[in-house]
Amino acid sequence: MNRVTIRVPATTANLGPGFDAFGCALSLYTDVTFQETEEVGLEITGCDEEFTGPDNLAYASYCAVLASLNEPVKGVKIHIDAHIPVCRGLGSSAALLVAGAMGANVLRGNRLSTQGLLNITNAMEGHPDNLAPAFYGGLTASMVDNGLPVTVNFPLHPGWEFLALIPDFNLPTSLARSVLPEQVSRADAIYNISHGAMVLKALELGDEKLLRNGMQDKLHQNYRKKLIDDYEKIEALVRTTGAAFCLSGAGPTLLCITRNPGLEEKLAKKLDSITEHTWQMLPLHVEFQGAHIV
């Protein structure tokens, strides 16, 4: 085999209080095709020219896996068919890292486990919250122990509906991290630990009220929302519907989770009239299948 296409789901990280720990795979995808060539060299298509060099994340993780296998990097053509918007808090970077790692592994006979691929990509990304659900699918919680990620899947009630509100502007993760404090109070740490536990149980039980209350956070959202125009107006509107609400990852995408149908229609009636930017509403569901060959 000298050609493979990997499909990776979008992911939403944090889910409110689960900062750098919780993640969930969603029904939006990026496909990346890797084709080895006889000639040494790199050709990347399907993305902006600025991402066609050797620092492309899919190529970087592809090379990292080959290096871990003590395999030379041959010539390769990479085509990216991305439907996950860039710098919107939906795991676009993680999708490329996962695709590159899995693509290289498949082309070398699947010699590394999924955990091995997660170890390599986590060393590149720095946190496993998006990577874990991209690899494993579903709802995950992760920690880093002695430098290595440890991930578990959690059950999800089948009745949840997700609605992503995606703005017409981006927010680089580096900027979203730069506004966070270096230290937090003990009270805020306890607040997030307790609320995070409630989020996981609420998602399992299908308890919308518990989820709505549990998704409150004191570690990152209050700082990041200042970077997102319309945040407080949209949050207030969503609260009137009874849906749970949080930042998707570092933002700027906002995520609504509900068990009641018709949320998109309810928001559509008022969203444009209260916001300065254009917000795309994208209904999604949980994707229980992680990255795989197509």
Feature locations, PLM:
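Gly/Ser-rich oxyanion-binding loop with an adjacent helix/lid
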Residues: 67, 72-150
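Solvent-exposed alpha-helices and their adjacent loops that cap or buttress functional pockets
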Residues: 12-14, 23-26, 70-72, 89, ...
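Active-site rim beta-loop-alpha module in soluble metabolic enzymes
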Residues: 164-225
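Short beta-strand-to-turn element immediately C-terminal to the catalytic PLP-Schiff-base lysine
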Residues: 35, 134-136, 140-145, 256-259, ...
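Glycine-rich, charge-dense phosphate/pyrophosphate-binding loop(s)
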Residues: 203-294
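ATP-binding N-lobe of GHMP and related small-molecule kinases
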Residues: 1-88, 102, 106, 110-112, ...
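Glycine-rich beta-alpha junction loops
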Residues: 28, 38, 138, 166-171, ...
